Structure formats: C-alpha cells, structure tokens
Amino acid sequence: MPKPEIVFVTGNANKLREVSMILGGDASPFTLVNEPLDLEELQGADLQEIALAKLQQAVHALGPGRPVFVEDTALSFDEFNGLPGAYIKWFIKSMGLAKVVKMLDSFENKGAYAITTIAYADSKGQLHVFQGKTHGTIVDSRGHTNFGWDSIFQPDESQNNETYAEMAKEDKNKISQRGRAFAQLKEYLYNTGI
C-alpha cells in the first residue's frame, strides 16, 4: 500500500532537502511531495499571518483535501526590535550578506534570533501552526553562502562557535529554528496522521 502524500510548497531546493531529512526521509510514514508554486508573500511583521496567507494560496491552488504545508523564516536583530524579521531575504537580495552584517557595526550587541513558522492544512482542511526559535549572534560570513543567511548566524547552542553554514546538517537540524518547528510538525503528523 502506498504511503499517503503530504505537499511542501517551496521553490528552495536547500529547504526541501533539509525538511525531508528532519521529517524522516524515506523512513517516514508519508511521502513528501514538492510543489514549487509561486505564492505571493504577504508583507508584514506577523509571522503567523504571513504563513497562513501563503497556506491559503497553496490550498486554493492545489485544491481541498490535500495535506499541505508552507514555511516562512525570519531573522531578527535584537538592536533593531525585530527587524529585518520576515524581510531578511529582501535585505540579503538587495544588500548582500556583508552589508547586512555591517548594519550592526555601530552596536555592541550583535544578538539575533531566528524563527520558522509552519502553516499546515490537514486533509480535512483544518489549519495548524508550528513555530521554532533559536537565539544567536550575527557574525562575519563563515562557511558556504548558498543557503540564505546561514553563514552569518552563529547559534548560541553551537558546540564549536560555528555558523549554521559551518555545522554538519544533522547538528544544525537539532538546534535550528527550522529543525525545532519541523520536529513539532513531525510529532503531530506521526501522532495524528495527515
């Protein structure tokens, strides 16, 4: 009997690989299917509102009854009262990583926190939200630069003062905001089904 499918709407191949690993890969009781839909991203500071708006678009595009989830991740600087937050990818796209780091040059506190918000619609159309959070420090870029801001975020729980980009994937997934949020989704799915 084939495993039930759950749809992850993302166009980010790195994110897809990471989430597949966190949810159990081939050993999971469901099949993770990717739909790279082009969703309009609501602009704002409320992460749950942003994720739920993306989810509603995904449900509309895929049709009712298909279990589907979306995620949105924010990186917030302590000194900037939550900014750039959900706008981080636009900051990086327009300024580059080095200038994003430079924004904190005049501040002693380089503290930051990352939040991943997952919005999930089950097969009955019920909506669920899961969030994970990790605190850390903004540092000069270290490690690969092919996955967003991973090379400038050093989580407080890093054993060797490594950025996400320098960490082994398995280690990163244990402490990252995305790993924490998807661990909640995984527990929910494994306990209640899709």
UniProtKB/Swiss-Prot annotation:
Can you quote a single GO CC term? cytoplasm
Pfam families hit by this protein: Ham1p_like
Q: In terms of domain of life, where is this protein from?
A: Eukaryota
Q: What InterPro entries does this protein's entry cite?
A: ITPase, ITPase-like_fam, RdgB/HAM1
Q: Which amino acid positions bind Mg(2+), per UniProt?
A: 41
Q: How is the cofactor bound?
A: Binds 1 divalent metal cation per subunit; can use either Mg(2+) or Mn(2+).
Q: Name one GO molecular function term.
A: XTP diphosphatase activity
The UniProt family comment states:
Belongs to the HAM1 NTPase family.
**What functional role does this protein have?**
Pyrophosphatase that hydrolyzes non-canonical purine nucleotides such as inosine triphosphate (ITP), deoxyinosine triphosphate (dITP) or xanthosine 5'-triphosphate (XTP) to their respective monophosphate derivatives. The enzyme does not distinguish between the deoxy- and ribose forms. Probably excludes non-canonical purines from RNA and DNA precursor pools, thus preventing their incorporation into RNA and DNA and avoiding chromosomal lesions.
Family matches, as PANTHER family:
INOSINE TRIPHOSPHATE PYROPHOSPHATASE (PTHR11067:SF9), INOSINE TRIPHOSPHATE PYROPHOSPHATASE/HAM1 PROTEIN (PTHR11067)
Q: How does it assemble?
A: Homodimer.
Q: What name appears for this protein in its UniProt entry? A: Inosine triphosphate pyrophosphatase
Please report the organism this UniProt entry assigns to the protein. Answer: Kluyveromyces lactis (strain ATCC 8585 / CBS 2359 / DSM 70799 / NBRC 1267 / NRRL Y-1140 / WM37) (Yeast)
Output the lineage of the source organism: Eukaryota, Fungi, Dikarya, Ascomycota, Saccharomycotina
